[in-house]
């Protein structure tokens, strides 16, 4: 049939229908959606949290709950933000909700990095803990060393791009001693 899968597949990307079969490589014509409406709501909530007034925090909370309601998410103690809302706690709740809502969409690293970088890397420990907890024991020291250098948080620009565009400059973490001929 042109494909084989072992284990679990991410059905929202592979399915033809809810109960149907997975797409074959010849049927890979999916219209990839980069921004879904729930993500737009969560982006707005993040912006409101950054504004920081209680009215903005209440509005941000309402947007997060709108996303959760649409997804039929279970209620828990962590979803109760009645009364005065703490901006840091709501921001963490938002980050967790983005992880749940946008799972497998390739956005988590950028969410965590944006969260960690805010206010001059005030929350770099969050990024470091997340990375170290998911790394094998033998890789943790090198990972800690690499991520400790803030310049490493973005990929290098490919050599072909540097050669074709004279205005581009390599990300400093990935500069080499050899000169790239443009």
Predicted feature locations:
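Acidic/polar-rich alpha-helix caps and helix-coil junctions
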Residues: 1-182
């Amino acid at each position: 049939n042109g494909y084989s899968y072992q284990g679990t597949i991410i059905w929202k990307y592979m399915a033809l229908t809810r109960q149907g079969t997975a797409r074959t490589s010849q049927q890979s014509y999916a219209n990839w959606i980069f921004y879904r409406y729930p993500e737009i709501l969560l982006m707005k909530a993040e912006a409101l949290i950054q504004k920081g007034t209680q009215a903005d925090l209440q509005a941000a909370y309402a947007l997060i709950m709108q996303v959760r309601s649409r997804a039929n998410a279970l209620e828990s103690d962590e979803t109760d933000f009645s009364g005065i809302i703490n901006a840091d706690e709501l921001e963490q709740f938002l980050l967790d909700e983005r992880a749940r809502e946008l799972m497998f969409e390739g956005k988590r690293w950028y969410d965590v990095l944006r969260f960690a970088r805010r206010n001059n890397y005030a929350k770099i420990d969050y990024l470091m803990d997340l990375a170290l907890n998911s790394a094998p024991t033998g890789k943790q020291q090198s990972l800690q060393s690499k991520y400790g250098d803030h310049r490493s948080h973005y990929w290098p620009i490919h050599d072909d791009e540097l050669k074709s565009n004279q205005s581009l400059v390599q990300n400093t973490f990935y500069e080499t001693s050899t000169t790239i001929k443009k």
